Design a protein with these regions (language model features):
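Conserved, mostly hydrophobic/aromatic
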Residues: 25, 60, 64, 85, ...
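Catalytic cores of alpha/beta
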Residues: 254-270
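Cysteine-centered iron-sulfur cluster-binding motifs in ferredoxin-type domains/subunits
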Residues: 53-65, 76-84, 88, 92, ...
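Conserved SAM/AdoMet-binding glycine-rich loop
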Residues: 91-247, 251-255
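N-terminal pre-triad scaffold of radical SAM enzymes
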Residues: 39-68, 86, 101, 283
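Flexible, acidic/Gly-rich N-terminal and inter-domain linker regions that tether
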Residues: 1-50
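Glycine- and acidic
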Residues: 6-8, 39, 49-55, 65-76, ...
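C-terminal accessory regions of radical SAM enzymes
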Residues: 1-14, 18, 260, 272-276, ...
Length: 293
């Protein structure tokens, strides 16, 4: 790309890591402790939050216009093997201050583990920034079964009292009207496992807005799918007698969002019974589409 008298060279992204490469990188002998220079400064809040968490995969195919995860980690999912994940769980249980609780079995989006193209040659030719917007690609395998199986294996570990999912769940992947890949019931199986065993009081999801016009610019699905997800979530919670509120995240001031849209957001979320605590005001982030709109 010419810039005046100079030429800017942009290297292509590195290829997606294979499972064996992921396992090697995570199997290195990490101390799982902060850098020694912080020893005299007392507890580090950010470290305390994630010290007993397990990162199961890298990458995100959501392609949200305000997000840089795909630029940093890639659009394609690089997943660790079950053996590597369980090895890390075992390491965590040996920590002297471990009390039996894993804070997160997750990734950039909690529920994209092992998801990839059925025919990866089609993916190699694809230039779309998202695999799930405006619709889910027919070539994308979105089965939640491998993830459900790992949750259950971790649950059965004798030293684990509870393993929570602290990463954000991509809820639209679990709505049958949006994601048709539920012929074997993998959505329902995953949702029951998640809601009954892995929610630490409340579940975080990110519809981001209620205005479909704004959501299209964000590359997010229509808010009607959040209604469908909430209905399913409430039904499963009621079935098992659980009171675990949904916590939806929203963005204000996003490009394409008008004051009227924010007024409607306030009214619609109030009608749904939400008392919003967390609304992020849009911050232009380098390397995002939303930054340059």
């Amino acid at each position: 790309q010419k810039v005046g008298e100079d030429v800017l060279v942009i290297n292509p992204p590195f290829k997606t890591m294979e499972e064996v490469e992921m396992d090697k990188s995570f199997d290195l002998p990490y101390t799982r402790l902060p850098h020694p220079k912080y020893r005299k400064r007392g507890p580090i809040p950010a470290f305390e939050m994630i010290k007993f968490s397990v990162n199961m995969h890298r990458g995100c195919f959501g392609g949200c216009s305000f997000c840089t995860i795909s630029a940093h980690q890639g659009k394609f999912i690089a997943s660790r093997s079950e053996k590597s994940i369980m090895k890390e769980v075992e390491q965590i249980t040996k920590a002297p201050d471990f009390k039996g609780y894993i804070s997160d079995l997750g990734g950039p989006s909690a529920n994209m583990y092992r998801m990839k193209g059925k025919d990866e040659e089609i993916c190699a030719r694809c230039v779309s920034p998202s695999c799930i917007h405006p619709v889910i690609c027919n070539n994308l395998d979105t089965s939640h079964k491998p993830l459900t199986d790992i949750y259950r294996k971790v649950d059965k570990h004798p030293a684990i009292k509870k393993a929570f999912v602290g990463s954000g769940v991509r809820y639209d992947l679990l709505v049958d009207d949006f994601n048709k890949n539920n012929s074997d019931g993998n959505h329902d199986e995953y949702m029951e496992q998640l809601i009954t065993r892995h929610v630490s009081g409340r579940l975080k999801v990110a519809p981001e807005h209620t205005s479909d016009a704004t959501l299209r610019i964000m590359r997010k699905p229509s808010f009607k799918y959040f209604h469908a997800f909430k209905k399913k979530y409430d039904e499963i919670s009621a079935k098992f007698g659980l009171k675990q509120p949904l916590i939806p995240y929203f963005i204000s001031s996003h490009p394409g969002c008008e004051e009227e849209d924010m007024a409607n957001l306030a009214a619609e979320t109030k009608d749904l019974g939400f008392h919003l605590e967390q609304v992020q005001d849009f911050t232009p982030t380098p390397m995002t589409v939303a930054e340059v709109i």
